[in-house]
């Protein structure tokens, strides 16, 4: 029996259970912008990704997609570009994609749990980390790492899932209502996310956070070329379909 019937999880979380399609959503620089991601989320390809746990025999099913904004690096010392990352200790949660990206930047991946990240930044265990903008601010990371570089390496794709156990107890009408509510929520998230993020970014800028814009993503993409090919070559055709959905 399960204690939770539904959850909102990062799409990447499913890769621990063998969901390889979901992994593609977390590859650096897959989505050029939000419109690119929503083209995917609203496409005929999205249900294939959402249904992957079912195909693998996992006891959960995907309902809809959302996103929590692009993820950016933030550091204790000011950085103005990619060259400044050489030798930095950057916090990772120990997934191979993130490790490979950090190594590609010339930095060293350092595993620290999220709960310990604030003190790790404060005490110099790590020199920086990465999060979506809203998480960066709400966890008070600017207090200890006041430099935010808007590289936007990945878009934080999230999805709602429901257990087979809970789904099986619903009538067909109730199941249809949940899927309909999911579609509405997905559309609401698309409208809300960017507006909310821009507001937080303005607050950060006006409170003295050193926000660095990245006008040219090419050097970043180049630095990630190895980790991108290593993690997409087994699904090259599917990955290309994702890339081709750009707005």
Residue ranges and their predicted role:
Residues 1-36, 45, 51-247:
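N-terminal secretory/targeting leader peptides
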Residues 39:
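Short beta-strand-centered segments that line the small-molecule binding cleft or hinge
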């Amino acid at each position: 029996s399960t204690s939770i019937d539904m959850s909102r999880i990062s799409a990447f979380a499913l890769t621990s259970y063998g969901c390889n399609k979901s992994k593609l959503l977390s590859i650096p620089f897959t989505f050029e912008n939000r419109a690119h991601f929503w083209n995917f989320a609203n496409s005929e390809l999205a249900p294939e990704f959402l249904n992957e746990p079912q195909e693998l025999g996992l006891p959960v099913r995907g309902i809809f997609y959302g996103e929590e904004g692009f993820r950016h690096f933030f550091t204790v010392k000011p950085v103005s570009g990619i060259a400044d990352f050489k030798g930095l200790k950057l916090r990772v949660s120990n997934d191979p994609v993130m490790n490979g990206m950090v190594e590609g930047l010339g930095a060293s991946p350092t595993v620290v749990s999220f709960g310990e990240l604030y003190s790790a930044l404060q005490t110099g265990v790590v020199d920086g980390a990465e999060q979506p903008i809203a998480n960066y601010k709400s966890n008070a990371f600017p207090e200890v790492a006041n430099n935010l570089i808007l590289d936007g390496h990945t878009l934080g794709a999230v999805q709602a899932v429901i257990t087979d156990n809970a789904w099986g107890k619903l009538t067909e009408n109730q199941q249809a209502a949940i899927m309909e509510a999911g579609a509405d929520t997905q559309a609401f998230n698309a409208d809300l996310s960017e507006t909310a993020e821009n507001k937080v970014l303005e607050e950060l800028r006006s409170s003295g956070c050193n926000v660095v814009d990245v006008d040219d993503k090419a050097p970043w993409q180049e630095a990630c070329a190895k980790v991108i090919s290593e993690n997409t070559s087994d699904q090259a055709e599917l990955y290309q379909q994702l890339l081709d959905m750009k707005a």
